[in-house]
Amino acid sequence: MVSDGQVFPVPADLARDAHIDAAAYDAALARVEADPEGYWRDIAARLDWITPPTKIKDVSYAKEDFRIRWYEDGVLNVSANCIDRHLPAKKDDVALVFEGDEPGTSSTLTYGQLHEEVCRMANVLKAQGVKKGDRVTIYLPMVPLAAVAMLACARIGAVHSVVFGGFSPDSIAGRIQDCASHFVITADEGRRGGRRVPLKANIDEALKHCPWVGKVLMIRWTGADVPLKAGRDIVWQDVRDTVSADCPPEPMNAEDPLFILYTSGSTGKPKGVLHTTGGYLAWASWTFWAVFDYKPGEVFWCTADVGWVTGHSYVVYGPLANGGTSLIFEGVPNYPTPSRFWEVIDKHQVSIFYTAPTALRALMREGDAHVTKNDLSSLRLLGSVGEPINPEAWLWYHRVVGKEKLPIVDTWWQTETGGMLITPLPGATALKPGSASKPLPGVKPQLVDAEGKFLDGATEGNLVITDSWPGQMRTVYGDHQRFFETYFSTYPGKYFTGDGCRRDADGYYWITGRVDDVINVSGHRLGTAEIESALVAHETVAEAAVVGYPHDIKGQGVYAYVTLKAGIEATDALRKDLVLWVRHEIGPFAAPDVIQWAPGLPKTRSGKIMRRILRKIAENELGSLGDTSTLADPSVVDDLVKNRAGT
């Protein structure tokens, strides 16, 4: 185990050339205290505004007067900020580099070409009746047209809801229903790790539950022969050239919605996280520039899918708002071999690489030779996102990929935060393996105990943020009360992150994981209630409880306790059926790693399942189960311990 004491100082040459060095970081901290309005105004001023904002911040976390507004009288367009304003100087510069699933498949889009594609798709949407404020569901593979679709929506003021390509038809339908989307953009199929993903077939299945969806715009990607529904389905390649290559950007108020992105909560139904136009883009743009210390002409590669917030903020909006070059990768880290990531870095001369600990742990297991046989000399900065990175993986990343020279920005943030909140700055922050380090200037984290009392100094507690920042989500779509209750009612006057955290004597923050009923599997947030609901929907299952447990590769695995209906035999075949069932109901990433048959579950006399005990059994911490005397039937625990499934 690495001690808190292991520190990697900022390299002198990097500090010298960085956008923000230690002195600039300290100056920003001082300024945000002395002149917060000026500080936040300057962050907004990095964007092009049709009408610059004069009202910078209007925020109250109080229940009786709850509101979050940033730059509320400003007017701008996100698409124009990501494309049009760069055209005079960067029309022929590469905006997007594409690397396909199969090696040897790659292409580029310049800012001029991106402008044309976005305008044409925006005009197709308008021709099909999509208007400002309409919700558009996007279910696409990791290809440049996914970014084009998002930017086309932003151009005309439509609100995009991107659904990850790994979600099942039922999950897609739930997301379409929740935001009452009438228009879907998809592809015939996706490619991933040498396999085909039946995107259009999944949409067709989902839309059986959403008959109000009037139009589906399908991109021919693999060329698969897929059925088209007359009057509903339109093929992008058939209509692209029928519309103008120019589409004026729609002026949008800073607080107009930009997108909805669904994320798992501690209750069953996913939440539609709503981000707005001005504050979100200002924060995504500034954090990209500051944290990645981005310099013109560099190739930036974030491996996240656009179906997740990391793909929104740091594949599309952050890089393009800065006039950068962003790499979009269709494939997976280990196809066709575990050298693939490193080959892509070499091939495209990637300067900044941002990936998830899950991928690093899997590649670390394959051995160093897959990395070292490639030329990674183009790399300048490494990043980690999605879950806490264990110190062993951090040190491997630093030693083998970074040649013991490159800084690692271990970034902590959430779908709800829009962009990074706690992270090193490469030119300013000494690094501790496994620590997200310190908050960005203007971000106000605190640790609290269960009663909400502030904990000072070196301590451990629940992580809250005591004041707003521009990228903060504004509401849960269609359920503002759920927004308040989920994030602001546990600790009144503070945003509750749902994460536990430790702070050391140097003020560095170490994220310890979720403290609510949410687990983080390979950087994907999954609500345990969602998986439990899927299991209980199976005809053989009477009851289910799901917890996370430590997993060598994924960070956390899914451990399910399942009580079968009377007369149903517990067999290995049924266990496999239940795993496939969850894959079908939610998606492959939610499939249980372990299913333990449970004749009964540990419940209090009021009927509440004691998940704390289930977590301890799953983690094999059998000596610390705690007091079981309050359970209705303590003998249930003995049975679960005796029949614990191996992990």
UniProtKB/Swiss-Prot annotation:
It catalyses: acetate + ATP + CoA = acetyl-CoA + AMP + diphosphate. Its cofactor is Mg(2+). Keywords: Acetylation, ATP-binding, Ligase, Magnesium, Metal-binding, Nucleotide-binding. GO terms for molecular function: acetate-CoA ligase activity; AMP binding; ATP binding; metal ion binding. It comes from the Bacteria. ATP binds at G386, E387, P388, D410, T411, W412, W413, Q414, T415, D499, R514, R525. Belongs to the ATP-dependent AMP-binding enzyme family. It is an enzyme of class 6 (ligase). This is Acetyl-coenzyme A synthetase. The keyword Glycosyltransferase does not apply.
